[in-house]
Amino acid sequence: MPKQVIIPPGTTTPIAPFVPGTLADGVVYVSGTLPFDKQNNVVHIGDPKAQTRHVLETIKSVIETAGGSMADVTFNSIFITDWTNYAAINEVYAEFFPGDKPARFCIQCGLVKPDALVEIASVAHIGAPT
């Protein structure tokens, strides 16, 4: 089955050669998502909760555009710049995954823009198209 490019309406033009998501064989692959506005500027500078919420809302829009929901997420890759933000990021993360949690990992690293505190990439299994 060929892949389908997923670009939600009003999505920011990426700053590198990639798309927000792809769908193949009922699996949505969401690119690493940063807390960017439509001009690729970091939003909510210094606020890990607001940045995490922005990132997860963006991921949600990609998955919903593909026909799924956040309940379909099976794996997240989380990148944070400072472990002191870990609890705040997890607090917001739990709001988006209230039931069965997806598998994930979380590492501390530098991100592409210094004011970004969190980046998340996701995988969601939405099943065969109807």
Curated annotation (Swiss-Prot):
SUPFAM superfamilies in alphabetical order: YjgF-like (SSF55298)
One GO CC annotation: cytosol
Keyword Hydrolase: yes
EC number: 3.5.-.-
A GO term, aspect molecular function: deaminase activity
Keyword Hydrolase: yes
Signal sequence interval, chain numbering: none
Catalysis: reaction(s): (Z)-3-aminoacrylate + H2O + H(+) = 3-oxopropanoate + NH4(+)
Keyword entries, A-Z: Hydrolase
Single GO biological process annotation from the record: nitrogen utilization
Name of the top EC class for this enzyme: hydrolase
Family, as annotated: Belongs to the RutC family.
Role noted for this protein: Involved in pyrimidine catabolism. Catalyzes the deamination of 3-aminoacrylate to malonic semialdehyde, a reaction that can also occur spontaneously. RutC may facilitate the reaction and modulate the metabolic fitness, rather than catalyzing essential functions.
PANTHER family: 2-IMINOBUTANOATE/2-IMINOPROPANOATE DEAMINASE RIDA, PROTEIN HMF1-RELATED
Protein name listed in UniProt: 3-aminoacrylate deaminase RutC
Biological classification of the source: Bacteria, Pseudomonadati, Pseudomonadota, Gammaproteobacteria, Enterobacterales
Protein encoded by which gene: rutC
